[in-house]
């Protein structure tokens, strides 16, 4: 069965309780083809409080092989401060 990029998710549930531990809020397909680049907005659940934390971003690369996507690499942006530093650097490098 062939898989579509729209089916990719990073949500994770606890195997024992079925409770969501990583909640996907949004996603963007950055590049399509045999190698897909995607950006996900997500929240982790705090194991102690049970509450979801501040939104984070994960950039991921998937390789499509025999109709399915295999995760090949990822980079997580841990919070607003790191995102702002990345944005500032990209603006400087690309003069935007």
Predicted segments, located by residue:
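Positively charged, low-complexity terminal tracts
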Residues: 1-84, 88-96
């Amino acid at each position: 069965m062939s898989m579509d990029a729209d089916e990719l998710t990073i949500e994770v549930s606890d195997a024992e309780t079925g409770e969501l531990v990583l909640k996907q809020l949004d996603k963007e397909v950055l590049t399509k083809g045999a190698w897909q680049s995607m950006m996900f907005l997500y929240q982790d659940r705090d194991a102690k409080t049970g509450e979801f934390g501040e939104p984070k971003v994960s950039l991921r690369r998937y390789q499509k092989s025999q109709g399915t996507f295999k995760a090949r690499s990822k980079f997580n942006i841990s919070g607003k401060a790191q995102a702002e530093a990345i944005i500032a650097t990209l603006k400087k490098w690309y003069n935007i």
